[in-house]
């Protein structure tokens, strides 16, 4: 049996420590994956710093991390989509389950079968690792029935005649959401900084606006004139003012437009929600427990192989080995735009 090492959080607000960890076994409907690349996310350093203050169920020591790409080394009972040797990309849910065996920051990790997709050989592990958490966040907000409940994507989509607002199109979640919504038959209007306009248009957005312009709300209102709104997905960073502005702009746009009156939020709802409009905070790991993960992680493998879904944003490899993960988290705290920080494992 191989030796497993992990970058472990020993306690709240403590730096990661690389040490030997138990070698995981594949339980029912689960696979064990040898990690070749992992990405870091804001939720990782937030959990590291805040622990049970952020997620009451968190106990230490704990292996954090959500995004991995690697090779299947074992499958558990009931697994039908994968076999040892398969290349995969997947969402590790250890933070949600408080189970270190399911955390990404280690050499061997357990994934749920329905939270993983086959990875075509043309796509490198390090680029694939940017996808999972952002993908899960997007599919919860877009397709779960208790959120926007949009039509499911297809390689041959049927146009719905509806237009969706995605605030934060150049974020990791936004890059996934634009592609998914277009593949589901929706027109997408989005926002980002001007230097990322070409990126979001290449992913399928038909119109894009600078979210920093004082006229942004008027610009969006005019863009949606005469269109049927499918609702909105509001994605923003960790700065409270930016998050509030994003939520309020989306809520007001939906309230003033014809069509669906729902906004999926990556931030807490603001205090004043317009009458007739509903909104809900997105918690990505909820998708593991419903049919949307089965449908969409199945679709992801097909779309990656077909070339109709691109692993975006760009991966920036900031180190090799588990010892580099803490540095990646520190770098992420300083702010990143239109890229995702990745660590490769030898």
UniProtKB/Swiss-Prot annotation:
* Pathway assigned in UniProt: Secondary metabolite biosynthesis
Q: What drives induction of this protein's expression?
A: Expression is under the control of the azaphilone cluster-specific transcription factor azaR.
The answer to whether keyword Protease applies is no
| Molecular functions (GO terms) | nucleotide binding; oxidoreductase activity, acting on NAD(P)H
Q: What class of enzyme is it?
A: oxidoreductase
> Where along this sequence does the record place binding of NADP(+)?
43-48, 170-173, 193-196, 211, 251-252, 336-337
What name is this protein filed under?
Answer: Dehydrogenase azaJ
This chain's source organism reads Aspergillus niger (strain ATCC 1015 / CBS 113.46 / FGSC A1144 / LSHB Ac4 / NCTC 3858a / NRRL 328 / USDA 3528.7)
Encoding gene (name): azaJ
